[in-house]
UniProtKB/Swiss-Prot annotation:
GO terms for biological process: protein catabolic process. Its EC number is 2.3.2.6. It is found in: Cytoplasm. InterPro entries: Acyl_CoA_acyltransferase, Leu/Phe-tRNA_Trfase, Leu/Phe-tRNA_Trfase_C, Leu/Phe-tRNA_Trfase_N. One of its GO terms (cellular component) is cytoplasm. Keywords: Acyltransferase, Cytoplasm, Transferase. This is Leucyl/phenylalanyl-tRNA--protein transferase. It comes from the Bacteria. Belongs to the L/F-transferase family. It catalyses: N-terminal L-lysyl-[protein] + L-leucyl-tRNA(Leu) = N-terminal L-leucyl-L-lysyl-[protein] + tRNA(Leu) + H(+); N-terminal L-arginyl-[protein] + L-leucyl-tRNA(Leu) = N-terminal L-leucyl-L-arginyl-[protein] + tRNA(Leu) + H(+); L-phenylalanyl-tRNA(Phe) + an N-terminal L-alpha-aminoacyl-[protein] = an N-terminal L-phenylalanyl-L-alpha-aminoacyl-[protein] + tRNA(Phe). GO terms for molecular function: leucyl-tRNA--protein transferase activity. Functions in the N-end rule pathway of protein degradation where it conjugates Leu, Phe and, less efficiently, Met from aminoacyl-tRNAs to the N-termini of proteins containing an N-terminal arginine or lysine. It is an enzyme of class 2 (transferase).
Length: 245
């Protein structure tokens, strides 16, 4: 039985999440609210919300957990060629937090294979936008010829980044944004990006699964570190493309 959380109820221990045999592996709790304080507490415990419009807020902590270590990020030859072109061409830009709510709205509209509708509702956008105003959620955006053509957003506490969603209106636009984010995180010695659930796309970029116990232990140690700065541009890609020392 999944517990229902009232406004003042704490999350149960992550070990109580449903198992694979339940049909909803990783489901921990449900609630009616998506308050910023609840969101912050969730991320700091390795928990995230994911639900469909019309459902209660469902809180998840899957085991295993998909992560991407910035040092293990895989750049294919074609992506490397694209990144070099982006660096040479002044019409391409990386902007950080230029329009966070717009990035969320674009992610909500992006078609997803095997998924109908979106969980990124207006209430979700409002909640994450509050975190953004607090400096705890960020958008990394790919711009071309003065137009935003792709990007991603996520939540950041201390030395931990929790990826949420990405979109692309032109080929590789989301990968360009992710590449810039990865090197920014490498520069600041961030060891892990939370990717939540396994997909072949994330695996192709170097993502892999780890046990929930190891993930939660890392999160609890990382989130209390000093926050990193969130100001960078496409010049970070120069170091990403440099030969390993």
């Amino acid at each position: 039985m999944v517990p229902w959380l009232g406004p003042d109820d704490p999350f149960p221990p992550v070990e109580r999440a449903l198992s694979a045999a339940s049909g909803a592996p990783g489901l921990l709790a449900a609630s009616a609210d998506l308050l910023p304080s609840r969101l912050i507490d969730a991320y700091r415990r390795g928990i995230f919300p994911w639900y469909s419009d019309g459902q209660p807020v469902l809180w998840w902590t899957p085991d295993p957990r998909m992560i991407l270590r910035p040092r293990e990020f895989k750049i294919s030859p074609s992506l490397k060629k694209t990144l070099r072109r982006v660096l040479r061409d002044d019409t391409w830009e990386i902007r950080v937090d230029a329009d966070f709510p717009a990035v969320m709205r674009a992610c909500a509209l992006a078609p997803r294979h095997g998924q109908r509708g979106t969980w990124i509702t207006s209430d979700v956008i409002d909640a994450y936008s509050t975190l953004h105003r607090r400096g705890e959620a960020h958008s990394i955006e790919t711009w071309h010829a003065g137009k935003r053509v792709g990007g991603l957003y996520g939540v950041s506490f201390g030395k931990m980044f929790f990826g949420e969603s990405m979109y692309a209106e032109v080929t590789d636009a989301s990968k360009i944004a992710l590449s810039a984010l990865v090197f920014h995180l490498r520069r600041h010695e961030i060891e892990m990006i939370d990717c939540q659930q396994n997909t072949s796309h994330l695996a192709s970029l170097g993502g892999r699964e780890i046990a929930r116990k190891a993930f939660v232990a890392h999160v609890r140690a990382a989130v209390d570190s000093a926050p990193i700065p969130w100001s960078f541009d496409k010049s970070v890609l120069r170091d990403l493309l440099a030969p390993a020392q």
